[in-house]
């Protein structure tokens, strides 16, 4: 038996013994009466007190005798004082043997790390300068049956951090910070758009036709209606129906689902912002996106320079704007324009680069395959990649000067796609033809090709104003702003294989 396995078994036996002891303590609490009281109401948060009274001296606090009621989880217990933690931070609470009843002092000795307590008393400052609560009353509110990870081993196993996020949040301030930032980012995006007259809406999660993106859907069955339904891969077609209906500026922040691979950049369930504005084009969205990203960086980091790993992304500088075609040539000087304009040569380049070439792809799709294999990972600083071929952009408007490409961009930062946007196709007949082409692609073996959506075509036949739309991956954006290496670090409960 390996030493590692033996150590793991020893730790498990030790944990089981600790759990058994804590259950005995809970049984003793039950015998006293209500072991889980719910009649305490706090009036202060730990970190708020730290901030509010940071400049008060020991003498000033003693003279003021400021009463407070706090509650939190015991993170440190030294007998005469404890450190408790709430959602804002930590504060010390002092066990004063002169003022607390003997019964309470005896109970305090039985409390463990992880227990949740209430504390009432007055604020004071120690000789070392630490703010604390000198308790006049303290109670156990919730007994923790499982021990917290000890300070030496901690919760260092990454997979366990994802599986037991509740423990991760208890013991890792970095994790708590990440999800506070995530909430802050989403709140600011919402504020940013509402201030610009966008209307927040909700569209169906369950759809009869999965549309709005090239992706594999999750399929389910509606029992009452006896029909197949799909978890949405994107809200796009419903949001554009709303633009047709007269809601000219709309947005939605919600979940999308794609039945595809899991990686440091992909989770089957993820959060997207999608927004649409009439009487605008993809260039307007580029400007809006730059403005939003600069505001978010300034809000979260206090700077438009965004550190990520060993790199720094500069959001304060104009984002590079480059076409798919030109970016391939720029980052692969051994290739020529003639190489990319010949379908047979492009097919060979794509195959050599590692793309999954089926053999029926047109020139535009082959160019995108080459771009994905040879260029994407090289786009470190923010890049708007524009002029995607129309055959891979079935919902985007063709470019007026070159109908082989569309008025579309994707934003890349750190070699990752962060956003996708375009001037929307509002020609109903052209849209119908492109849907038919997508159906042919699907019949030829492309699982990610789109279905034909007759109702969406009908909506366009009523007339949609010139419109620009965009989708931004919230998870990847938060990864950048929190310097997180994996998408699982910014999703509270990422998908994992069941434990054996």
Curated annotation (Swiss-Prot):
Transmembrane region(s): none
Family annotation (CDD domains): LysRS_core (cd00775), LysRS_N (cd04322)
Cofactor notes: Binds 3 Mg(2+) ions per subunit.
Pfam family, any one: tRNA-synt_2
Any single GO CC term annotated in Swiss-Prot or TrEMBL for this entry: cytosol
Binding sites annotated in the UniProt record for Mg(2+) 1: 410, 417
Keyword ATP-binding among record annotations: yes
Protein EC: 6.1.1.6
GO BP annotation list: lysyl-tRNA aminoacylation
Reactions the enzyme catalyzes: tRNA(Lys) + L-lysine + ATP = L-lysyl-tRNA(Lys) + AMP + diphosphate
One GO MF term: tRNA binding
Keywords: Aminoacyl-tRNA synthetase, ATP-binding, Cytoplasm, Ligase, Magnesium, Metal-binding, Nucleotide-binding, Protein biosynthesis
Cofactor(s) needed for function: Mg(2+)
Subcellular location(s) per record: Cytoplasm
Principal location: cytoplasm
Residues annotated as binding Mg(2+) 2: 417
Description of how the protein assembles with itself and partners: Homodimer.
Protein family: Belongs to the class-II aminoacyl-tRNA synthetase family.
Record-linked PANTHER family: LYSINE--TRNA LIGASE, CHLOROPLASTIC_MITOCHONDRIAL, LYSYL-TRNA SYNTHETASE
Name the UniProt record assigns to this protein: Lysine--tRNA ligase
Organism: Pseudomonas putida (strain ATCC 700007 / DSM 6899 / JCM 31910 / BCRC 17059 / LMG 24140 / F1)
